[in-house]
């Protein structure tokens, strides 16, 4: 996963992390500004061998620290973030779906599962 509700978003992390850590992440994950650091990081997660890959919506949307859900041991501003109308577009959904196909993470339909069972 790129994170949980208890840590900053990808974009928030890139703005606040130590420069050496950011440099290392960019090199290790081969990130570039054109694609977006969030998309490169998410692709690394989706491309791993784990059974599950979890990416918060704030990372898909490329939101900074203002999208953080929770700061542990604090009161007042936690659990306030909500997606607003128009943020989740059909173009974004298609982009996510395409990546799910590329990284073999797209959920199979009932028909596809049945076809696999009969092929065995």
Enumerate the language-model features and the residues they cover.
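Catalytic cores of glycan-processing enzymes that make or break glycosidic bonds
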Residues: 1-120
